[in-house]
C-alpha cells in the first residue's frame, strides 16, 4: 500500500479522508429545524381549495331513474287534443313514448305537436322525428340513437328486425 500512497503524493492526489468521519453523530431534538415544505403544502392546498366551484344548484331537483334493465316504450296515437297530456304523463314516469299523429287533421296535428314539444322542452327531454308524423319522445337522461331512423328510411318506411 505504501507504493500507492507514495504514488498519490507524487501525483498530488490525497485521500479526502476526514478524521471526524468515524465519529458517531447523535440526533439532538434541540437541533430540529422546521421545514418550509409543510408551509408550502398548506399554502398550495389553500390555493387549490379556492379554485373548486360547487356544481350543486339548489334550484335543481334530483331525478329518480328506473333501472335500465327493462325499457318500456309506449306508442300513442291520439284521436283528439285531449289525449296529448297522456303522452306527457308517460315521459314524467321516465319512460319512452312514440307519438303517431298520421291519421289526424292538420290543425289537430299542429295543436298536439305544439303541446307535446313545449312539454318536452320544459322537462329537458328530447324529441326526434322518425317519419313525417311519427316522433320519439324521451325523458331527461335518455339518448336517442339515429340508427333506427336511418333503417326506416332505407327500407321505404318499414322497420325490419
UniProtKB/Swiss-Prot annotation:
Which top-level group of life is the source organism from? Bacteria
- Cystines in this chain: none
Q: Which residues form the signal peptide?
A: none
Keywords, in A-Z order: Cell cycle, Cell division, Cytoplasm, Septation
- Principal subcellular localisation of the protein: cytoplasm
User: Single GO cellular component annotation?
Assistant: cytoplasm
Subcellular location(s): the record lists:
Cytoplasm
Pfam families per the UniProt record, alphabetical: SepF
* Family the entry assigns: Belongs to the SepF family.
Q: What is this protein called?
A: Cell division protein SepF
The record lists the organism as: Finegoldia magna (strain ATCC 29328 / DSM 20472 / WAL 2508)
**Lineage of the organism:** Bacteria, Bacillati, Bacillota, Tissierellia, Tissierellales
Amino acid at each position: 500500500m505504501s507504493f500507492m500512497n507514495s504514488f498519490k503524493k507524487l501525483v498530488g492526489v490525497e485521500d479526502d479522508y476526514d478524521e471526524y468521519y468515524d465519529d458517531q453523530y447523535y440526533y439532538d431534538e434541540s437541533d430540529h429545524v422546521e421545514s418550509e415544505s409543510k408551509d408550502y403544502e398548506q399554502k398550495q392546498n389553500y390555493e387549490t381549495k379556492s379554485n373548486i366551484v360547487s356544481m350543486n344548484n339548489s334550484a335543481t331537483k334530483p331525478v329518480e331513474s328506473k333501472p335500465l334493465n327493462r325499457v318500456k316504450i309506449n306508442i300513442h296515437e291520439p284521436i283528439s287534443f285531449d289525449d296529448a297530456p297522456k303522452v306527457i304523463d308517460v315521459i314524467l314516469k321516465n319512460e319512452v313514448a312514440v307519438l303517431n299523429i298520421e291519421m289526424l287533421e292538420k290543425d289537430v296535428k299542429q295543436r298536439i305537436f305544439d303541446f307535446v314539444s313545449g312539454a318536452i322542452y320544459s322537462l329537458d327531454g328530447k324529441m326526434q322525428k322518425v317519419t313525417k308524423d311519427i316522433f320519439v319522445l324521451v325523458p331527461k337522461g335518455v339518448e336517442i340513437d339515429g340508427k333506427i331512423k336511418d333503417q326506416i328510411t332505407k327500407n321505404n318506411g318499414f322497420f325490419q328486425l
